[in-house]
């Protein structure tokens, strides 16, 4: 019995010695989550184009060699955060938002250039960029201070069909006006020529020249 108790005591002593490397490894993996973070910078103000397109860079530092990055764009409304678009990518040049067709971007080292399309005036607000370095460990996360995006709706353009009808109406009006002016001018010209000719050709006999007067010579007799 004494030997059995001694063996159990030795096993209990050896169990912590075998598990402590795993505990240390997990500690090293999860300590950076709470102790280290990345700094994310983004412009403070961006004005969207007349087509509702806004682009802004999202840069994080310090730079870490990572194979998998997750970028999330959040919109802050009062005290609430709404996810606009998010993606996880591993390529070095393109950032694909498969579930968000109105978002696109490019990646270059530690800089992500984001583009949001289809914005309207009601979408004006503060947009925050969140960056997560997923793989390889350790895990890093950071969020920017936000970019205020201003969107101005363009003035509504007139209907193209309406403009086409206006152009056709003006063209027809000018055509009939020129036709009327030409008809009036031709009528006046014909009225001026009517007293001079009846418009019927009549063959006239040739006129004979007036005969010269013949004088009888007057002789004066001389005795």
From Swiss-Prot:
Origin organism lineage: Eukaryota, Metazoa, Chordata, Craniata, Vertebrata
Chain residue ranges for the region called Homodimerization: 46-50, 150-155
GO cellular component, one term: protein complex involved in cell adhesion
Topology of this chain in the membrane: Single-pass type I membrane protein
Processing after translation: N-glycosylation is important for dimerization. Phosphorylation at Tyr-201 prevents binding to the AP-2 adapter complex, blocks endocytosis, and leads to retention of CTLA4 on the cell surface.
Region (Important for interaction with CD80 and CD86): 134-139
Major subcellular site: membrane
Alphabetical UniProt keywords: Adaptive immunity, Cell membrane, Disulfide bond, Glycoprotein, Immunity, Immunoglobulin domain, Membrane, Phosphoprotein, Signal, Transmembrane, Transmembrane helix
Domain named Ig-like V-type: residues: 36-145
GO BP annotations listed: adaptive immune response; regulation of T cell proliferation
Cytoplasmic side: 183-223
Signal peptide: 1-35
Membrane-traversing stretches: 162-182
Compartment annotation: Cell membrane
Record organism: Mus musculus (Mouse)
CDD domains: IgV_CTLA-4
Name used for this protein in its record: Cytotoxic T-lymphocyte protein 4
Disulfide bonds: 58-129, 85-103
Extracellular side: 36-161
Quaternary structure, from the entry: Homodimer; disulfide-linked. Binds to CD80/B7-1 and CD86/B7.2. Interacts with ICOSLG.
Glycosylation sites: 108, 113, 145
Lineage top rank: taxon: Eukaryota
Function: Inhibitory receptor acting as a major negative regulator of T-cell responses. The affinity of CTLA4 for its natural B7 family ligands, CD80 and CD86, is considerably stronger than the affinity of their cognate stimulatory coreceptor CD28.
In-chain residues carrying the UniProt-annotated modification Phosphotyrosine: 201
Tissue specificity statement from the Swiss-Prot or TrEMBL entry: Widely expressed with highest levels in lymphoid tissues.
InterPro entries: CTLA4, CTLA4/CD28, Ig-like_dom, Ig-like_dom_sf, Ig-like_fold, Ig_sub, Ig_V-set
């Amino acid at each position: 019995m004494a030997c059995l108790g001694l063996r159990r005591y030795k096993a209990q002593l050896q169990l912590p010695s075998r598990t402590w490397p795993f505990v240390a490894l997990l500690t090293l993996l999860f300590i950076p989550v709470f102790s280290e973070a990345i700094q994310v910078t983004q412009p403070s103000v961006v004005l969207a184009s007349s087509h509702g397109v806004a682009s802004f860079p999202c840069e994080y530092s310090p730079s870490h060699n990572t194979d998998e990055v997750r970028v999330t764009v959040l919109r802050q409304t009062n005290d609430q955060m709404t996810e606009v678009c998010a993606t996880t990518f591993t390529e070095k040049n393109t950032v694909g938002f498969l579930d968000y067709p109105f978002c696109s971007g490019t990646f270059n080292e530690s800089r992500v250039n984001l583009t949001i399309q289809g914005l309207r005036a009601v979408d004006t607000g503060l947009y925050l960029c969140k960056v997560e370095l997923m793989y390889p460990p350790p895990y890093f996360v950071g969020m920017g201070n936000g970019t205020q995006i201003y969107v101005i709706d363009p003035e509504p353009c007139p209907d193209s069909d309406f403009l086409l009808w206006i152009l056709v109406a003006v063209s027809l009006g000018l055509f009939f006006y020129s036709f009327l002016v030409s008809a009036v001018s031709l009528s006046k010209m014909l009225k001026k020529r009517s007293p001079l000719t009846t418009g019927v050709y009549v063959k006239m006999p040739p006129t004979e020249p007036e005969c010269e007067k013949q004088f009888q010579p007057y002789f004066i007799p001389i005795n």
